[in-house]
Design a protein with these regions (language model features):
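Divalent metal-cofactor coordination and adjacent catalytic microenvironments
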Residues: 1-252
Length: 252
């Protein structure tokens, strides 16, 4: 289970104009909003690494139809489990793989005839989807380390936006994805979910740069507005009740 949220806790606090208070109800609303958007759109809003099978197009066996949106192609195998050189494949419209050196061979049927390994997700500008945090690991970590030490947890990132780290954020250390669960700005430490979104937790040396994922701006705004509705709804209902009435539970 991922704890990624499309909008971060810091962005949500700024949106609500709330600087203090408990993190838990805010994160609960952000996670509910993220899950709701994914459920309604049938899309994953964060990148993830994995294998998926693609279906061969019988009217043109140079092409196969992907079942999800592909952001980056890592490897591909045909129906006979033979690797296909990546330079012979072109991604069209995010959902079709076109083969340049011939056709995809058919074996047993077109459904699931091609196996694809890559980064999947929903983003309209994958080339610009990651930005430097202007920070790095202050100490080496192994695959089991849940806490990362950094130079300045609430400093400016490469775009001069602060804080550079916030709960709900997806970060990348070399090839590993991590989700930030909480930030201790005083100690300059991050508590994270390691090996997130299909990647594997690995050892990383001190001074390894850390990047942050940038969801499309319209995804962030949709998440903020929906999370605000989820967050405020029980508060508004409670205000309308008699003082001795129990506080209603959120309807998500």
């Amino acid at each position: 289970m991922t704890l990624f949220t499309v909008a971060t806790l810091a962005e949500f606090r700024a949106y609500l104009g709330v600087e203090t208070g408990a993190d838990a109800p805010l994160l609960h609303a952000l996670r509910a909003a993220t899950a709701h958007i994914e459920h309604q759109t049938h899309r994953r809003l964060a990148p993830w690494l994995g294998e998926r099978y693609a279906d061969l197009l019988l009217h043109d066996q140079r092409e196969c139809l992907l079942r999800e949106e592909l952001l980056a192609l890592h490897a591909c195998w045909d129906a006979f489990d033979q690797p296909i050189p990546l330079e012979e494949l072109v991604l069209l419209y995010g959902s079709v793989l076109h083969r340049l050196d011939g056709v995809f061979p058919l074996r047993g049927g077109p459904i699931g005839a091609v196996r694809v390994l890559g980064i999947w997700g929903c983003h309209d500008d994958w080339a610009q989807a990651w930005r430097s945090t202007d920070d790095a690991l202050s100490a080496p970590i192994d695959a089991a380390t849940p806490t990362l030490s950094v130079a300045d947890a609430d400093g400016l990132d490469a775009a001069l936006i602060a804080p550079r780290f916030s709960a709900g954020q997806l970060i990348r250390i070399e090839e590993e994805f991590c989700v930030v669960l909480s930030v201790d700005a005083a100690a300059n430490t991050l508590h994270v979910q390691r090996g997130a979104h299909g990647t594997s937790a690995a050892a990383h040396a001190a001074s390894t740069p850390i990047e942050r994922y940038l969801p499309p701006a319209h995804h962030v705004q949709s998440c903020l507005r929906l999370a605000a509705f989820f967050y405020r709804q029980p508060l508004e209902e409670a205000a309308a009740l008699p003082t001795d009435a129990p506080t209603p539970r959120p309807r998500l």
